[in-house]
């Protein structure tokens, strides 16, 4: 990470896409995409996905590390080009607890991530606890972030500290996506970004963490990009000019969250304007969902009814029977909720792919289609972009390859934005 930031600060229009997903096919897609490019790949886990208690994935930080390393080994991707990051590391999971116990758990969370070898750490202590006022005083946020940084510094070995980097600040929705529709988005004011930096610098120095300040590479801000279930707010460079200018006076860059579904030109403009770390998550699993749905339509054309996976029906049954991950986010009317379940840009389906019934039905779908020849016309009908790549000879028509390539469509847009010599 330090090399990428140094090159950017030296004037090179370079950035990095942060892949925020625990889905094995998404991770495989990212690693295969840059297998021969020489680029580093940044994969991040969030505190609610992966923590010392298992998170909703059931993985602790060391488990997630081994999970990613296992995929890298299968792909042949070298570990030295793999960066592991932790996103929103702090008390997000324990906001309903008193400050003392929530911070104790947050400190242990940081220690677990650093001990497992994660080298990019987002210190996010912006949430109010059960006994806190709302909103929190910025200095309180900074002091808590400094305590988290102290935990990281005391855990990291000297070798780890060579690679250890921190991201501070937060101006993003609750991790997991917007719960309601958006009509506009507030662009961070440059004076607020400056205040974030100043309060964190003061809090770090008060704990003797002067050396750690040199490891702070980025500040999270809102450059004016967002999405909800049905709409996207696209980047408007002129609205963020003052913010973009301010960061030039620092040794840092910006980290932009919720950059999913922006255009490839917007990614290039964001990187040009010093939002050099672009986070993406739901857009990748949305592409995965599109691929699975497309393959299900092919299965309906090629496989006899009694042999089909019924994957779309299984998804509906599971999500309707177990609505915990989508109920408070989607519209209450049944017909509208079904549209959201299937097609929402926030892609709450992503929480259900590990469900045993859904996983088994996806496996059967792929097995069924592996046993037949996929007609080119059928691929053209349901996956036209992949059909073009088949015609160009850069893709072979297996179900697995079609899924991977569909996810990589998203990554191609980020590569255009993050790599100056890509046309």
Curated annotation (Swiss-Prot):
The keyword Nuclease does not apply. Pfam families: GatZ_KbaZ-like. Pathway: Carbohydrate metabolism; D-tagatose 6-phosphate degradation; D-glyceraldehyde 3-phosphate and glycerone phosphate from D-tagatose 6-phosphate: step 2/2. One of its GO terms (biological process) is phosphoenolpyruvate-dependent sugar phosphotransferase system. Keywords: Galactitol metabolism. Component of the tagatose-1,6-bisphosphate aldolase GatYZ that is required for full activity and stability of the Y subunit. Could have a chaperone-like function for the proper and stable folding of GatY. When expressed alone, GatZ does not show any aldolase activity. Is involved in the catabolism of galactitol. HAMAP family: Tagatose_aldol_GatZ. Forms a complex with GatY. PANTHER family: D-TAGATOSE-1,6-BISPHOSPHATE ALDOLASE SUBUNIT GATZ, N-ACETYLGALACTOSAMINE PERMEASE II COMPONENT-RELATED. Belongs to the GatZ/KbaZ family. GatZ subfamily. This is D-tagatose-1,6-bisphosphate aldolase subunit GatZ.
């Amino acid at each position: 990470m330090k090399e990428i930031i140094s090159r950017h600060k030296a004037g090179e229009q370079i950035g990095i896409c942060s892949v925020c997903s625990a889905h094995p096919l998404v991770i495989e897609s990212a690693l295969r995409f840059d297998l021969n490019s020489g680029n580093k790949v940044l994969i991040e886990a969030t505190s609610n996905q992966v923590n010392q208690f298992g998170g909703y994935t059931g993985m602790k930080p060391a488990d997630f590390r081994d999970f990613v390393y296992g995929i890298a080994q299968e792909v042949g991707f070298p570990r030295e080009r793999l960066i592991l990051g932790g996103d929103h590391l702090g008390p997000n999971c324990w906001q309903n607890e008193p400050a003392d116990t929530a911070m104790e758990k947050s400190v242990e969370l940081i220690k677990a991530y650093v001990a497992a070898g994660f080298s990019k750490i987002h210190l996010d202590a912006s949430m109010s606890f059960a006994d806190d006022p709302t909103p929190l005083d910025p200095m309180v946020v900074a002091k808590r972030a400094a305590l988290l940084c102290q935990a990281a510094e005391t855990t990291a070995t000297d070798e780890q500290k060579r690679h250890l980097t921190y991201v501070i600040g937060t101006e993003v929705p609750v991790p997991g996506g917007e719960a309601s529709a958006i009509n506009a988005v507030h662009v961070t004011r440059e004076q607020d970004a400056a205040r974030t930096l100043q309060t964190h610098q003061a809090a770090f120095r008060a704990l003797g963490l002067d050396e750690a300040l040199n490891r702070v590479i980025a500040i999270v801000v809102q450059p004016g990009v967002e999405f909800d279930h049905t709409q996207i707010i696209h980047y408007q460079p002129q609205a963020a000019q003052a913010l973009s200018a301010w960061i030039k006076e620092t040794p840092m860059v910006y980290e932009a969250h919720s950059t999913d579904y922006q255009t490839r030109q917007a990614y290039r403009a964001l990187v040009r304007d010093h939002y050099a770390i672009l986070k993406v998550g739901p857009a990748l699993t949305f592409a995965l969902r599109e691929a699975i749905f497309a393959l299900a339509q092919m299965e309906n054309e090629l496989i006899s009814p009694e042999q089909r996976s019924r994957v779309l029906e299984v998804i509906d049954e599971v999500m309707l029977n177990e609505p915990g991950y989508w109920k408070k986010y989607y519209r209450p009317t049944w017909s509208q909720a079904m549209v959201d379940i299937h097609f929402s840009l926030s892609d709450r389906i992503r929480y259900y792919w590990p469900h045993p019934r859904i996983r088994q039905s996806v496996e059967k779908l792929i097995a069924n289609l592996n046993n037949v020849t996929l007609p080119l016309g059928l691929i053209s009908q349901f996956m036209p972009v992949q059909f073009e790549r088949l015609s160009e000879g850069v893709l072979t028509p297996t179900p697995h390859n079609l899924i991977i390539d569909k996810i990589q469509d998203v990554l191609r847009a980020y590569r255009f934005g993050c790599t100056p010599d890509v046309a």
